């Protein structure tokens, strides 16, 4: 199922974004240029995640237009993963903001 594939890719992008921002924070003082690169990579991964998330939303909306509401089980799973992904995305964005605010 394509939505499962997209959800897995969203998870990967979030994990990568988190890893990059944590590296950026870790190396900010000792290696500022490399830390900035890690920050930029974290931003890029979040951009990928947002594109994938939008695609999931588009697929659900297309399903609604063509055949009506998706099965309840599918929507329950989507809502669970959506909440999980948005929580992780918020935590990453907070860390990205902290990185930019640190002197």
Model-found features: residue ranges?
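Non-heme di-metal
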Residues: 1-103
């Amino acid at each position: 199922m394509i939505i499962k594939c997209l959800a897995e890719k969203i998870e990967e992008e979030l994990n990568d974004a988190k890893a990059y921002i944590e590296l950026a924070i870790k190396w900010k003082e000792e290696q500022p240029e490399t830390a900035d690169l890690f920050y930029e990579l974290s931003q890029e991964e979040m951009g990928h995640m947002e594109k994938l998330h939008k695609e999931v939303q588009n697929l659900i909306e297309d399903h609604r237009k063509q055949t009506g509401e998706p099965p309840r089980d599918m929507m329950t799973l989507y809502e669970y993963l959506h909440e999980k992904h948005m929580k992780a995305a918020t935590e990453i964005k907070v860390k990205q903001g902290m990185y930019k605010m640190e002197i």
